[in-house]
From Swiss-Prot:
Keywords: ATP synthesis, CF(0), Chloroplast, Hydrogen ion transport, Ion transport, Membrane, Plastid, Thylakoid, Transmembrane, Transmembrane helix, Transport. In plastids the F-type ATPase is also known as CF(1)CF(0). Coiled coil: none annotated. One of its GO terms (molecular function) is proton-transporting ATP synthase activity, rotational mechanism. F(1)F(0) ATP synthase produces ATP from ADP in the presence of a proton or sodium gradient. F-type ATPases consist of two structural domains, F(1) containing the extramembraneous catalytic core and F(0) containing the membrane proton channel, linked together by a central stalk and a peripheral stalk. During catalysis, ATP synthesis in the catalytic domain of F(1) is coupled via a rotary mechanism of the central stalk subunits to proton translocation. It is a single-pass membrane protein. This is ATP synthase subunit b, chloroplastic. The lineage of its organism: Eukaryota, Viridiplantae, Streptophyta, Embryophyta, Tracheophyta. Belongs to the ATPase B chain family. It comes from Coffea arabica (Arabian coffee). CDD domains: ATP-synt_Fo_b. F-type ATPases have 2 components, F(1) - the catalytic core - and F(0) - the membrane proton channel. F(1) has five subunits: alpha(3), beta(3), gamma(1), delta(1), epsilon(1). F(0) has four main subunits: a(1), b(1), b'(1) and c(10-14). The alpha and beta chains form an alternating ring which encloses part of the gamma chain. F(1) is attached to F(0) by a central stalk formed by the gamma and epsilon chains, while a peripheral stalk is formed by the delta, b and b' chains.
Length: 190
């Protein structure tokens, strides 16, 4: 087949009629001799080959290649659509997870914020209690110190008064009075 078409095509590249003498290469303006030579060459090289069969086979092959290409394209298109749907599904899933993480994150942040605020309030309350306890302790200590100081001063004042007022006669009278009290107590018990 290739030889026949190559031979036929090569005839179109031969020099024009004037160069070979009797052989005219212009197929459209040829005479009967040239046509018979061309037909002879075609018949000789194309034995057992039907031109319409060759053309039909060529067209069938071309049709099959086109159909195969279309089929492959449809398969690729179907695969691409399937992958696109899978990607869209994954995208929706990831978007939902992102929204859920965002919502959970916000609620977690709010929960942590509330926990922190509560913890700070508790700490402040404890500090306030410690402050009040410290103030009460210091007040009580100060009151005790003042009492002790007042008691010491009163005791010193009383001792000073006693020492200035005491003499031997007062001592003897106090001792006699105490002995009398003890004696009367002893009589009552007997």
């Amino acid at each position: 087949m290739k030889n026949v078409t190559d031979s036929f095509l090569s005839l179109g590249h031969w020099p024009f009629a004037g160069s070979f003498g009797f052989f005219n290469t212009d197929i459209l303006s040829t005479n009967l001799i040239n046509l018979s030579v061309v037909l002879g060459v075609l018949i000789f090289f194309g034995k057992g080959v039907c031109a319409s069969c060759l053309l039909s086979d060529l067209l069938d092959n071309r049709k099959q290649r086109i159909l195969n290409t279309i089929r492959n394209s449809e398969e690729l298109r179907g695969g691409a659509i399937e992958q696109l749907e899978k990607a869209r599904t994954r995208l929706r899933k990831v978007e939902m997870e992102a929204d859920q993480f965002r919502v959970n994150g916000y609620s977690e942040i709010e929960r942590e914020k509330l926990n922190l605020i509560n913890s700070i309030y508790k700490t402040l309350e404890q500090l306030e209690n410690y402050k009040n306890e410290t103030i009460q302790f210091e007040q009580q200590r100060t009151i005790n110190q003042v009492r002790q100081r007042v008691f010491q001063q009163a005791l010193q004042g009383a001792l000073g008064t006693l020492n200035s007022c005491l003499n031997n006669e007062l001592h003897l009278r106090t001792i006699s009075a105490n002995i009398g009290i003890l004696g009367s107590i002893k009589e009552k018990t007997d």
